[in-house]
């Protein structure tokens, strides 16, 4: 059995990136304890790792962008075009397939179906009742959600709401709390509870249209929960309970007592960037694209997706791939002009006196030069034998 110090020294000499060295060292320690490896066996494993790593490296001049576009684009043609139910949570709809991929690469600020997966801390994750307590704190509840029936009394100029007792109890509220919350938020009306009937009497309202406006505001008013979050679903996964939410408010959900902030996640990449930073957003882009592809039974080498995520987050903010993002901001005038709105780009560049260095693929194709990809990246100079100069 080889000492840990020796293994560390052997791994540190290998020509590998630091993250692979760390992983290799951890694996070697594990296998060394399990199989009592000899020094030459450990060296053989390190050499094999270096060989495999070198085989995985791209050749200089490889057109990685084209290969990535093809590798992601081709399987995308086999994807479904409609919104399906989220795997395992039939009650919550979430965008899948090609529309979801487009949403991610377009870097849309508001996904069409935002959803959060909320994991709970040690105290709450194994007990359904405790998980329900946390779900109640998160779930957004409006008067409309609690109402069984609502009427506008024209004679008395009142808005009358019949509250469903079951829904009220499920939301963890009572009539007194409802009246208190509404009274604190609306100074232009009086609220009175008669059993499970809520009567709203607007002050200084003479027109029916004004009464309707107030009624609309009152019924949409949030009584509890996080803004942007609709219903919540509790599911058992393995031996723990997990909460799924329709709608997302990542910043606030991490502060809710009972939530495990280290595992909770959202499918809104902009929220992740704002709360956890750009590196987390990059990982989220990779994860979302990979899981969307997998959902459709498609496997794409993660390195193509990582390249896309790297390009989208390169400047420290999320940028879409397209006219308003990466392609529209290329340094080359000709590349921008070849993509979209040609004349506008050319006139603007001429006005500013821009010079195109012709470093990219598109601009070289445009003017008929060999592209700087593959063998085109190599510049050859011929060494001719020196001959004496003729007089």
From Swiss-Prot:
CDD domains: RNAP_A. It catalyses: RNA(n) + a ribonucleoside 5'-triphosphate = RNA(n+1) + diphosphate. Its EC number is 2.7.7.6. GO terms for biological process: DNA-templated transcription. InterPro entries: DNA-dir_RpoC_beta_prime, RNA_pol_Rpb1_5, RPO1C. It is found in: Cytoplasm; Chromosome. Its main location: cytoplasm. Gene3D superfamilies: 1.10.150.390. One of its GO terms (cellular component) is chromosome. GO terms for molecular function: DNA binding; DNA-directed RNA polymerase activity. It is an enzyme of class 2 (transferase). Keywords: Chromosome, Cytoplasm, DNA-binding, DNA-directed RNA polymerase, Nucleotidyltransferase, Transcription, Transferase. Part of the RNA polymerase complex. Belongs to the RNA polymerase beta' chain family. DNA-dependent RNA polymerase (RNAP) catalyzes the transcription of DNA into RNA using the four ribonucleoside triphosphates as substrates. Forms part of the jaw domain. This is DNA-directed RNA polymerase subunit Rpo1C. The gene is rpo1C.
């Amino acid at each position: 059995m080889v000492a840990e110090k020796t293994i560390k020294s052997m791994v540190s000499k290998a020509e590998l990136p630091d993250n692979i060295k760390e992983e290799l060292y951890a694996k070697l320690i594990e296998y060394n304890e399990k199989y009592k490896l000899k020094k030459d066996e450990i060296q053989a494993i390190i050499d094999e790792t270096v060989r495999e790593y070198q085989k995985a490296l791209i050749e200089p001049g490889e057109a990685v962008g084209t290969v990535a576009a093809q590798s992601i684009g081709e399987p995308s043609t086999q994807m479904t075009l409609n919104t399906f139910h989220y795997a395992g949570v039939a009650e919550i709809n979430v965008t899948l397939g090609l529309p979801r991929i487009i949403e991610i690469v377009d870097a849309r600020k508001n996904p069409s179906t935002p959803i959060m997966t909320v994991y709970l801390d040690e105290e709450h994750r194994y007990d359904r009742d405790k998980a329900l307590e946390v779900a109640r704190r998160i779930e957004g509840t409006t008067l409309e959600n609690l109402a069984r029936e609502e009427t506008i009394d024209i004679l008395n100029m009142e808005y009358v709401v019949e509250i469903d007792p079951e829904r009220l109890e499920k939301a963890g509220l009572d009539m007194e709390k409802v009246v208190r919350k509404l009274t604190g938020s609306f100074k232009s009306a009086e609220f009175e509870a008669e059993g499970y009937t809520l009567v709203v009497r607007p002050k200084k309202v003479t027109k029916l249209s004004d009464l309707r406006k107030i009624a609309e505001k009152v019924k949409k008013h949030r009584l509890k929960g996080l803004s942007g979050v609709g219903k919540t679903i509790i599911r058992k996964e393995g031996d723990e309970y997990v909460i799924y939410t329709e709608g997302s408010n990542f910043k606030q959900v991490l502060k809710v007592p009972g939530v495990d902030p280290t595992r909770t996640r959202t499918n809104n990449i902009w929220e992740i960037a704002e709360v956890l930073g750009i590196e987390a957003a990059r990982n989220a882009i990779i994860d979302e694209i990979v899981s969307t592809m997998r959902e459709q039974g498609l496997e794409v080498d993660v390195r193509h997706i990582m390249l896309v995520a790297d390009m989208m987050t390169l400047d420290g903010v999320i940028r879409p791939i397209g006219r308003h993002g990466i392609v529209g901001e290329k340094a080359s005038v000709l590349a921008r002009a070849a993509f979209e709105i040609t004349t506008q780009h050319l006139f603007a560049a001429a006005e500013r006196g821009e010079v195109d260095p012709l470093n990219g693929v598109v601009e070289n194709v445009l003017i008929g030069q060999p592209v700087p990809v593959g063998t085109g990246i190599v510049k050859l100079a011929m060494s001719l034998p020196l001959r004496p100069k003729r007089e």
